[in-house]
């Protein structure tokens, strides 16, 4: 039962192979804490909200937290502020464990591989992994899996570029950070992480669409958002290019290069054109063959993780050790 696990800033997602079908689960990374009272218990029972207990409180998490918060006139709390795990907050860590349990069922037998991606900005190499990454791996191990961490960019190449022999540039445009991976035949040659805060751009667009001025100024609002989005995308792509050039990684890219890209912002109407414009302005010194924007960006990274887990599960022990 191989599993791909995408631990993103705004949402956790899993995709597992049961042997007969693929099973997807997701959980938003927000929560609500209320007192453990009979009234709140009845509310949770009537809504069938996912929750746990913490001392004298009830912790509601995921989409259920938003629904209950609306009923109680309260506000949900984001778990991963700035894309980072909460520090010095054992309650928040317990909530994080509950969220992982909600989307990652206990392994039925053996120790199947779970390939996971973590919020951007953390070192992923075994000798530089932070305590936060090790904590996330421990949560996966407690569910009975053998955890393996991969980058979101690597997952994108595996998910989208099978037709290019799993070679190209994988881009994950996250809410807080953007990850880029140079991959050749399924092997990651280089990667970099760029702070992007694209989640704010998505929120800005949704807010403008829902505003009272949206109907009468829709064209102006759209044009303004597109300019802002293109400017920020160009900056991110330029910074990634400079980072990979400074490392000498650009010369490792096979040309013409294939690109695989996913992220919440890619669901915006007309994103393909905005990306192509930003790419042209960012000055990458490579020829591009194809650009694939994930058709299902929500689970693209989890799917790449699942593919990696299946491949690793088929490998010999000697190869995995290498």
Predicted regions and their residues:
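A structural feature that tracks compact, well-ordered secondary-structure segments
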Residues: 179-181
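Long, charge-rich alpha-helical interaction segments
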Residues: 213-220
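Conserved blade-ending motifs and adjacent loop-strand segments that build the rim/top face
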Residues: 295-298
